[in-house]
């Protein structure tokens, strides 16, 4: 009978995400991740093929949580008003998962995926592709006569909230008082 696992894959990825948010992915070593997780270094190596593979999982995990919420709200949007609400997924995500927000919004994707296994890179590419497809579909549905509808959706739902929260990250969490400002700017971008 094998020994009981010291840590789950999800808990290890979360610990690695916290280290990456605090120190940056370049300084996230297996030793610092093991300390954050409260497990021996050997337990980390037992759970992952390599540091590179673990960092890829950190980005993918954050992108999945964010992307699932973003796409669910975007697919449910039936008006520009409800589409504008999708922009609030970004600041709310950074408030509920500060480490995930820092991973996605304060670092480059390639900082986590460079040298990653092909399978992880393919999963990350699918997540990005799904987000782009969601924006395209929303533009066709909500701005059907606007030749620049796709651009407007991208600026309004990605660019504006990203710029607003990036002012605070990684050191601080964007305050809730920022949400009405993001919403107003998003509506302006969608309607002009």
Model segments located where?
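Short hydrophobic clusters on alpha-helical segments that form packing/core surfaces
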Residues: 12-20, 62, 66, 90, ...
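Hydrophobic alpha-helical connector segments
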Residues: 57, 71-99, 154
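Secondary-structure edge/capping motif, primarily at the C-terminal ends of alpha-helices
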Residues: 70-77, 104-112, 142, 164, ...
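Hydrophobic alpha-helical segments that form the core
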Residues: 91-92, 132-137, 145-170, 175-189
